């Protein structure tokens, strides 16, 4: 593994910025109302810092230097991305920021929960185990897996706002004694070696500048004999970086989802082995013969919606729904009810949605490359 320059952590700086930008909106149950309660100047600072990595850098002109600069700023890039996008995610999707497989007439939220529980089942999570959730978001998967398995889960996150929302949600549902959420960079974890019985990551380690780097940290904090399970975002082996269309799909996903550099599935396999793990199983779950594609909500395919709530969710993801949201947010910005730049972030998420659908349909990308691995006992 070539050396990766890690960003210096400054938790005090991040906490102060979070307090200015978000105020008490982390306690707000409504993500829509939370979106309106931001400090305009701090929001602009986050917006400018994030988009300086992407503006005027299309796929046709992207250089290796551009990618290396994003990797060097991986933690800041991801942290500010979620400062900008978290409320939009919660409002348009749910509190579990990931995709899933769907069965016929299976409700959206049920499918999301099943996807989480499937990973927990494959890992053998049990009552009383001490488990780490790497890149826990606002805690949706941790809450579901805690209920399902009875495990005690620690969520690791480098975004203070998401930690605040995760803590608030855990308290509302009475899981605050079973769940703990802590601040940290998953490339330089502060936990002692051999701390956890199991570790999982659900569509989160894609934000790492090096998969081998983050997997090595996971290996260090996992107890000997412990299991690591991951759903990884990767480009498939069909991806050709010399193909401009392929690069446009990748770059659209990266920009719209706060990713410094996405790699191929084969790189992920090599990385988990290089970190020291015994790879027990790996599979692209998107390649299973499912009757409904994983990307159907993003594609706005209403024919697959199984309930009124699902229909509304999918409608919001459709081009018509996104057009309506675009104009709603533009109106809110015009009347200074939402901070300037909210529309830009929402539009960027829309571009990412189109690229995710294209990547899925053309078999260039998968959000569910599952790997189950074990740390040797000796």
Residue ranges and their predicted role:
Residues 197-210:
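A short SAM/SAH-binding and catalytic strip from SAM-dependent methyltransferases
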Residues 130-132, 142-188:
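Class I SAM-dependent methyltransferase SAM/SAH-binding core
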Residues 187-199:
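A short acidic, Gly/Pro-enriched loop at the edge of an enzyme's catalytic core
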Residues 135-139:
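Class I SAM-dependent methyltransferase "Motif I" SAM/SAH-binding loop
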Residues 62-70, 76-125:
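Class I SAM-dependent transferase core
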Residues 241-368, 374-377:
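Substrate-binding/catalytic lobe of Class I Rossmann-like enzymes that use SAM or dcSAM, i.e.
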Residues 212-227:
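A short glycine-rich, Lys/Arg-flanked "PGG" loop and its adjoining helix->strand segment in the class I
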């Amino acid at each position: 593994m070539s050396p990766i320059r890690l960003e210096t952590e400054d938790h005090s700086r991040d906490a102060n910025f979070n307090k200015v930008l978000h105020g008490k909106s982390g306690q707000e149950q409504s993500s829509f109302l939370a979106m309106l309660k931001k400090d305009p100047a701090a929001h602009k600072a986050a917006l400018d810092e994030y988009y300086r990595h992407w503006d005027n850098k299309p796929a046709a002109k992207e250089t290796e230097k551009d990618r290396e600069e994003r990797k060097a700023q991986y933690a800041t890039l991801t942290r500010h991305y979620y400062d900008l996008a978290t409320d939009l995610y919660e409002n348009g999707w749910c509190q579990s920021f990931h995709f899933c497989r769907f069965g016929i007439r299976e409700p959206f939220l049920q499918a999301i929960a099943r996807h989480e529980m499937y990973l927990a089942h494959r890992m053998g999570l049990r009552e009383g185990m001490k488990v780490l959730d790497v890149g826990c978001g606002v805690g949706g998967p941790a809450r579901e897996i805690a209920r399902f398995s009875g495990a005690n889960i620690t969520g690791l996150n480098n975004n203070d706002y998401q930690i605040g929302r995760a803590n608030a949600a855990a308290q509302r549902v009475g899981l605050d004694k079973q769940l703990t959420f802590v601040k940290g960079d998953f490339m330089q974890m502060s936990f002692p070696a051999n701390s956890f019985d199991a570790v999982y990551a659900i569509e989160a380690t894609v934000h790492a500048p090096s998969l081998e780097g983050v997997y090595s940290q996971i290996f260090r904090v996992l107890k000997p004999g412990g299991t690591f399970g991951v759903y990884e975002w990767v480009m498939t082996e069909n991806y050709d970086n010399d193909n401009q269309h392929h690069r446009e799909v990748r770059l659209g996903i990266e920009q719209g989802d706060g990713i410094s550099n996405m790699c191929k599935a084969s790189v992920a396999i090599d990385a988990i082995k290089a970190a020291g793990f015994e790879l027990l199983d790996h599979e692209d779950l998107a390649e299973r013969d499912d009757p409904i594609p994983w990307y159907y909500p993003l594609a706005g395919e209403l024919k697959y919606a199984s309930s009124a709530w699902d229909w509304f969710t999918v409608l919001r993801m459709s081009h018509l729904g996104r057009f309506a949201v675009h104009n709603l947010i533009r109106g809110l910005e015009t009347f200074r009810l939402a901070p300037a730049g909210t529309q830009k972030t929402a539009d960027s998420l829309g571009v990412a949605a189109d690229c995710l659908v294209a990547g899925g349909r053309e078999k260039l990308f998968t959000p569910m490359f599952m790997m189950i691995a074990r740390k040797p006992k000796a």
